[in-house]
Amino acid sequence: MGGINGYEIGNLSSFDIKANDNTLFADIKNKHNTMNSSSAESLFQKLSKYADNYKESKCYWVQILAKNSFNEKWFGEINGKEYSHSRVYKISGDQFYKLLSGNENALFELYKILPEAILDYLKNQESENFQNNSALEEIKLSSKKSNRNILNEITFENYSYYLGFDKLE
């Protein structure tokens, strides 16, 4: 995402990605349920601080493996305290790719080119490196049972409800 024009990754800073003009700050997490309440409170306070310090900014908690597609203000109760800020949001991975790229199906289009990139990568690796990878073996077995390729097997388990992914056959 940091390769998208106008954005940079936050190498060892307190944000994961931001707009070059400081109008967007984001903290990226794989799943919403990987954070406990104190982590959520800390993240909300961090994003609120960016929003307060940069008056034109919007700040996002990005959930890459969210259960739905969404882009909404983040408000709620954490540790018995109510939290809200007019420019602090939570957003799913597909919506965040859309926001940064301006392309509604950006994550889906990235997905579509992954098979070629993965094949190129695998061709350059020694096969013995993958023989000891039990996770890869489990995915291979599962994909054979479902008659899907490996990438589709992984994707259908995680992204079937995201923007554009309903177009997969």
Language model features: what each stretch is:
Residues 11-20, 63:
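Short, surface-exposed recognition loops or helix-turn segments adjacent to catalytic cores
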Residues 4-5, 17-19, 50-54:
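Alpha-helix C-terminal capping segments
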Residues 76-169:
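Charged, structured surface patches that assemble and position nucleic-acid processing machinery
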Residues 31-93:
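Catalytic cores of nucleic-acid endonucleases
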Residues 13, 22-24, 55-58:
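Generic structural motif recognizing short loop/turn segments at the entrances and edges of beta-strands
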Residues 17-35:
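Conserved catalytic cores of phosphodiester-cleaving nucleases, focusing on short active-site segments
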Residues 1-11:
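Acidic-basic catalytic patches of nuclease active cores, encompassing PD-(D/E)XK
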